């Protein structure tokens, strides 16, 4: 009897497609996520492709998971909340700071926006680039210090920061277009708040608080080439 070929990491399997649908309905819609583009993208992107093989069975759980070098893939609801807060339209130019395993960048790319992503850990960044390419998603990703943003690609319609800053980096604020949105967790461990800044003028920003969150810190510089 011929053997059955196992699906690759880049090919969603039926039971995991069902798990994605359950995740969207029970974790996102039930908590108030309404942006259809966000929901559709998170139904489509295989989260199991962005976690270590040993944790693939937990990919659709309601919480973060470790991805190596002290970093995590965020809880699905938090990813959805942050991306919904960006209020994106197709074709928008979006910068993600702290790309990690590449999952949020994949969701953004699936939504039809132009994605630029920065990751300070080379091992994570290179692995994320490979995953995104395997899924046929177009993301410009580089290894670097997220505090500096990506001046050569600026200005951006939206910036997503997937790590908590003690303050909001001025370089990121400067790289927003007029009416551009910056979503970032701010504060010390145990006291972080998710904020959205909307640029209303050269040096004028409107702020909205989305409540308490918990993220790894936004660090300066480029990380060591530790194995993932």
Curated annotation (Swiss-Prot):
It catalyses: [protein]-L-isoaspartate + S-adenosyl-L-methionine = [protein]-L-isoaspartate alpha-methyl ester + S-adenosyl-L-homocysteine. The keyword Zinc-finger does not apply. GO terms for cellular component: cytoplasm. GO terms for biological process: methylation; protein modification process; protein repair. Catalyzes the methyl esterification of L-isoaspartyl residues in peptides and proteins that result from spontaneous decomposition of normal L-aspartyl and L-asparaginyl residues. It plays a role in the repair and/or degradation of damaged proteins. Belongs to the methyltransferase superfamily. L-isoaspartyl/D-aspartyl protein methyltransferase family. This is Protein-L-isoaspartate O-methyltransferase. It comes from Methylorubrum extorquens (strain PA1). The lineage of its organism: Bacteria, Pseudomonadati, Pseudomonadota, Alphaproteobacteria, Hyphomicrobiales. The gene is pcm.
């Amino acid at each position: 009897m011929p053997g059955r070929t196992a699906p690759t990491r880049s090919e969603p399997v039926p039971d995991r497609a069902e798990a994605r649908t359950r995740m969207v309905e029970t974790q996102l819609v039930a908590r108030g996520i309404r942006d259809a583009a966000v929901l559709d993208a998170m139904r489509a992107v295989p989260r199991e492709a962005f976690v270590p093989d040993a944790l693939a069975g937990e990919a659709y759980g309601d919480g973060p998971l470790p991805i190596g070098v002290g970093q995590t893939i965020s809880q699905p609801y938090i990813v959805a909340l942050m991306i919904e807060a960006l209020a994106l339209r197709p074709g928008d130019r979006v910068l993600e700071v702290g790309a990690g395993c590449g999952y949020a960048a994949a969701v953004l790319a699936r939504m039809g926006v132009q994605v630029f992503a920065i990751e300070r850990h080379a091992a994570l960044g290179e692995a994320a680039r490979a995953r995104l390419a395997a899924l046929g998603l177009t993301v410009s990703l580089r290894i670097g210090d997220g505090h500096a943003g990506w001046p050569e690609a600026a200005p951006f319609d939206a910036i997503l920061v997937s790590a908590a800053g003690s303050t909001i980096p001025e370089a990121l604020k400067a790289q927003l277009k007029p009416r551009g949105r910056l979503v970032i967790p701010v504060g010390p461990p145990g006291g972080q708040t998710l904020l959205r800044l909307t640029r209303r003028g050269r040096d004028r920003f409107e702020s909205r608080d989305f409540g308490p969150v918990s993220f790894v810190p936004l660090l300066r510089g480029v990380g060591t080439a530790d194995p993932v």
